[in-house]
């Protein structure tokens, strides 16, 4: 069996990835499938950190546009990510995989506080670490949280798992002529305003030379093939 190319990864999942076709909430079958794939990565010797968005439950920015205070909306979004993190923890533990949920907000009755050194130690012991509550601050996306945590834990690769195959010059659903990028620099993505991650997340990755792979989470086994060395999705690097 081919040895994994990456020893430690940070996998960013959108909250929408968990809801399937339901429109909201968590699809139990999709949750189980994603947990199974993550467990297989661990069995292959990869240390896995996770950041899961909360868009399947609530989006703070959207609530703000509806009249809710932005900070309050963002705090609601952070709590939504904790709900998703606990669901993933349960799904992984049902497979026998040890997991720790670490929150940027203090919720000691349900998860640990985020402490970088402790998180790294959990990873070294083969535990999946799910980083919840974003950065713990309003106005920052979970994409920014994923970039930050990937840098902090010294991940070899940040993977953004999406519903599309990678980075395009435009929405491929709306524009069949959209160009697919197999590789590009962060500066190119920023200059062209490509819809990859928000500016803060991209600049963090660029400045700290964190490679980012954007790929389709719904192609079963794709993450494992990537870890084994296949060229899947789009790769973003510091120029």
Swiss-Prot record:
CDD domains: AAK_UMPK-PyrH-Ec
Activity regulation summary: Allosterically activated by GTP. Inhibited by UTP.
Molecular-function GO terms, alphabetical: ATP binding; UMP kinase activity
A biological process term (GO) from this entry: 'de novo' CTP biosynthetic process
EC number: 2.7.4.22
InterPro entries per the UniProt record, alphabetical: AceGlu_kinase-like_sf, Asp/Glu/Uridylate_kinase, Uridylate_kinase, Uridylate_kinase_bac
This protein's UniProt keywords: Allosteric enzyme, ATP-binding, Cytoplasm, Kinase, Nucleotide-binding, Pyrimidine biosynthesis, Transferase
Function: Catalyzes the reversible phosphorylation of UMP to UDP.
Identification of the protein by name: Uridylate kinase
Gene field: pyrH
